[in-house]
Amino acid sequence: MKFPIAVMLIASLTLVSCSGGGSTPTIVTRILSDPVYDGDIGLDFVSGTFTVTKNNTQFVFAGIDPVTLDEYRAFLDFPLGGPGGVPLNAGIASATLDIFINDIQPPIGTIPMRIDLVYFQPPNLIGTDFDRTLQPALASITFPIFQSDFGRHVVVNVTSLMREAQRWGLPDFQVRIMEDLGPVVPGIIEIDDTTIAADRPFFAPLLEVAYY
């Protein structure tokens, strides 16, 4: 769940453990994705051509359209540097990705999803970023989308991905979200990526990291 804090883009809270006087403080930082670099890439099922949609798109798609069979992969970019970011020498206690689901198709069944940690600079999307061979994943996790997630926040544990990003010393936490391919029924989700200032603290993708 997101918190109605005006300065949500760079909000940090220091939590000091009460277990002992010499304990290391844990800092929690909340970082909204950068809509300038967020976007999605669609692969046309018939023609095999890519369509890149980026820069303040308001929403991004991930999954396979059950009607057209076009496949979409969403990309989210969270800057880790600067005030409110995550220092390169920090240890990661935990990390979560919070996304708001605007729509789910088809309106039945569960959609298996995959999140890849990726890295490309500058963070401008091009068609080949769709390809997991040409743009390989540094680490991956899977999670399900249920019909009950429609119109709600979905919070995914991305601790392993954030630790890998730290290990590589990445300046951004960049993820590719797609349907976990296999013998599954096609399904697609629409993720809110609003640029409306009043709405971003409530609906924009949010990375929350606890570090020490």
What are these regions (language model features)?
Residues 104-167:
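Beta-strand-rich interaction/scaffold domains
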Residues 2-9:
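Sec-dependent signal peptide recognition
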Residues 19-65:
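N-terminal leader/pro-regions and domain N-caps
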Residues 80-82, 99-103, 119-121, 160, ...:
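Beta-strand elements of well-folded, non-transmembrane domains
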Residues 45-103:
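A short beta-strand-loop element at or near the start of a globular domain
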Residues 69-70, 91, 147-149, 166-170, ...:
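Extracellular/periplasmic catalytic domains that process cell-envelope and extracellular macromolecules
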Residues 14-17:
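C-terminal motif of bacterial Sec signal peptides marking the signal peptidase cleavage site
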Residues 22-32, 163-212:
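Proprotein-processing/basic-patch segments
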